[in-house]
Design a protein with these regions (language model features):
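N-terminal secretory signal peptides that target proteins for export/translocation
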Residues: 1-5
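N-terminal export leaders
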Residues: 6-11, 15
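Hydrophobic alpha-helical segments of integral membrane proteins
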Residues: 16-27
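Extracellular/periplasmic low-complexity linear segments
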Residues: 26-72, 77-81, 87, 102-137, ...
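Terminal, regulation- and interaction-focused segments at domain boundaries
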Residues: 80-96, 147, 151
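Primarily extracytoplasmic ectodomains and periplasmic/lumenal surface modules that are beta-strand-rich
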Residues: 85-86, 94-99, 107-110, 156-160
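A short, solvent-exposed beta-edge/loop patch
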Residues: 138-161, 168
Length: 192
């Protein structure tokens, strides 16, 4: 009799667990409640992009970055790693995106020079050294027929390594958009 009681008890628990799991899935899948687009915390909101906000970033800065992420498929990029830095050529087939790209790049290079970290929530930790040692970077920026050309050099080997790393990160974002950010953050054990 006790073996039969145990078997019924185990089957009952199994059925309860199954229904509990199915119920949890259904509830968290409903629009507005779970892992869906606009859910309550278990999602990535790629419409409003709250991860683009920063403690020291204006709404305009965040909106400009959103333009780049929302239109990443119009952006192409070439990177040459130099022994003392990088040379990049970045372009967009969309004139409005190209304007945002140029403005963002020039503004960020200026902010690095001033040590003015925007502290964007999804910002790569690679940028930390730039804001700490911005005076160790020499930047030359031009807009040419081939695109936005950025040459950045440094005598500081740590800064050069960070320039190489960040150039690769930006290229990944130009290739994959926000997916690249999610992959980088997951690899670093970070969330936003």
């Amino acid at each position: 009799m006790s073996q039969m009681f145990s078997r019924k008890w185990v089957i009952g628990l199994g059925v309860a667990a199954l229904f509990g799991g199915v119920g949890t899935y259904v509830v968290t899948s409903w629009h507005g409640y779970g892992a869906g687009h606009h859910g309550m915390g278990l999602h990535h909101d790629e419409v409003n992009m709250p991860g683009l906000r920063g403690a020291n970033a204006s709404a305009e800065t965040s909106a400009e970055i959103a333009v780049l992420f929302n239109n990443f498929d119009t952006i192409t990029r070439e990177v040459e790693n130099l022994s003392n830095g990088i040379r990049t050529v970045t372009r967009s087939s969309d004139p409005a995106v190209m304007d945002a790209l140029v403005n963002h790049s020039v503004t960020m290079i200026d902010r690095v020079g001033q040590g003015d970290d925007p502290k964007i929530r999804i910002q790569s930790p690679t940028l930390d050294i730039f804001f700490l040692r911005g005076d160790a970077i020499t930047s030359h920026v031009t807009v040419e027929d081939i695109g936005l050309v950025v040459l950045q050099t440094s005598d500081d080997p740590d800064v050069v390594a960070a320039l190489h790393t960040h150039a690769a990160e930006v290229t990944a974002m130009a290739d994959k958009g926000m997916q690249a950010v999610h992959e980088m953050m997951a690899a670093q054990g970070r969330t936003h």
